[in-house]
Design a protein with these regions (language model features):
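Short, structured surface patches at the beginning of a domain
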Residues: 1-133
Length: 133
């Protein structure tokens, strides 16, 4: 599939620690480095980082998460890369809604930890079908 060169690769990470401790900073820096490395290794163009620190995965009002949704809905994103799926959402229904948004806007989801690329994985097909029945 040919990607539009003007579209971004959204690199999203979230740290739920509310403190500004050294551990939180290390976790954030580590996630960002892994996302950047993954994007580079997979030839994903125009990386843009979206990060939420100190927010629960059940909270869909996270500032960077809302910005991510806005650029997805504006068809400015070709790929979303996360370290693991729980960084996006911890709630089943919120995760399903996000996957439907990604599918509607032809965005490829990459999860490094789960080794997932795309929405054609069996787990996603089942999840996307769940709300239709």
């Amino acid at each position: 599939m040919i990607r539009q060169s003007y579209k971004i690769t959204a690199l999203y990470y979230r740290i739920d620690h509310s403190s500004h401790s050294a551990m939180s900073a290390f976790c954030a820096q580590n996630q960002q480095k892994r996302l950047m490395f993954y994007a580079r290794e997979h030839g994903l163009q125009n990386p843009k980082v979206f990060s939420d620190c100190g927010y629960s995965g059940n909270n869909t009002s996270r500032p960077a998460y809302r910005k991510l949704l806005a650029v997805i809905r504006a068809d400015e994103v070709s790929d979303v890369v996360v370290y693991e799926l729980s960084r996006l959402n911890r709630d089943f229904e919120n995760q399903r809604r996000l996957l439907l948004e990604l599918k509607a806007h032809n965005v490829t989801l990459h999860s490094i930890q789960e080794q997932i690329i795309g929405l054609d994985e069996p787990v996603f097909r089942a999840l996307l079908k769940e709300g239709c029945e």
